[in-house]
Amino acid sequence: MIYMLDTNICVYAINKHPDSYYNNLELLAKNNTIAISSIVLAELQYGVSKSKKKEQNQSKLDIFLSRLEIIDFSAKCTFYYGELRTELEQKGLIIGNNDLLIASHAIAENATLVTNNIKEFKRIPNLILENWDK
């Protein structure tokens, strides 16, 4: 199984509970793939770039990333993005562009998206969700 972590879960893990998260990630990684989308990586890198403690935060991010697989957003993902965006617009549902890209990526990879933003993502059909922020 592929678990694809959303940006908010990564930030939570890095800043709030690194030891317990790292232990859980290592256990899960024995039988599963723990990954992030390259879209999530871009959001995390943006967070580092705008922070006041760039070196410290880059180091924390690098340590966190060393435990994960980074999956590039591919041409296959663009199909799901186009379909999802059209469907949601027709229903009058607005979802942030990056969130829609991340959701499309998770669906294309047949991954479970791990997020604490269930309210936003539950509107997306065929997206498997879990919340580890408990």
Swiss-Prot record:
Q: One Pfam family this chain carries?
A: PIN
Report the source organism.
Answer: Rickettsia felis (strain ATCC VR-1525 / URRWXCal2) (Rickettsia azadi)
What CDD domains does the annotation carry?
Answer: PIN_RfVapC2-like
Q: List the disulfide bonds.
A: none
Complex formation: Forms complexes with VapB2; probably VapC2(4):VapB2(2) in the absence of DNA, and VapC2(4):VapB2(4) in the presence of DNA. Crystallizes as heterodimers with stoichiometry VapC2(4):VapB2(4) in the presence of its probable promoter DNA. The heterodimers are in contact via alternative VapC-VapC and VapB-VapB interactions. This subunit does not contact DNA.
Any idea of its EC number?
A: 3.1.-.-
Task: Return the broad EC class.
Answer: hydrolase
Q: Any idea where the PINc domain is?
A: 3-124
**Record family assignment:** Belongs to the PINc/VapC protein family.
Q: Which domain of life is it from?
A: Bacteria
What is the name attached to this protein's record? Ribonuclease VapC2
Q: Which residues bind Mg(2+)?
A: 6
Q: What is this protein's function per UniProt?
A: Toxic component of a type II toxin-antitoxin (TA) system. Has ssRNase activity. Upon expression in E.coli or S.cerevisiae inhibits growth in liquid culture; in S.cerevisiae its expression leads to apoptosis-like characteristics. Rapidly induces apoptosis (within 2 hours) upon microinjection into mouse fibroblasts (L929 line); pretreatment of cells with dexamethasone protects them. Probably contributes to host cell death if bacterial cell lysis occurs during host infection.
* Cofactor(s) in the UniProt record: Mg(2+)
Coiled coil regions in record: none
Q: What's in the keyword line of the UniProt record?
A: Hydrolase, Magnesium, Metal-binding, Nuclease, Toxin-antitoxin system
Gene Ontology terms, MF aspect: magnesium ion binding; RNA nuclease activity
Q: Which gene encodes it?
A: vapC2
